[in-house]
Amino acid sequence: MIGEMSPREFLDRREAGEEMTLLDVREDWELKLAPVPTHVVHIPMGEISDRIAELDPKKETVVICRSGGRSTQVAEFLERQGFRKVFNLSGGILAWSRVIDPRIPQY
């Protein structure tokens, strides 16, 4: 079962030096409209099965989308592919905008 991680927990852990992959599964236009101001691996949901080799299954992976729906599906897919440390970023970029950085547009 995949875990949930809040935007605040993710940012706190990242700032504490923990290595985690933040996987953004939104479309290109969404990333341009509302970018996450931290390093991300961007693989749109529709490309994940073809590009899964770009991810390290041993590394903790936190998946983000707009609101949490697509990221939950991708996190579940990754878990079925053998990834063991997979989390959904609760509330997606909308929650990030509300909790962390209100300059990020809501869309």
Predicted regions and their residues:
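Short, surface-exposed ligand- or partner-binding patches at beta-edge/loop junctions that are enriched
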Residues: I64-C65
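Rhodanese-like catalytic fold shared by cysteine-dependent sulfurtransferases
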Residues: M1-T21, D28-E60, G69-Y107
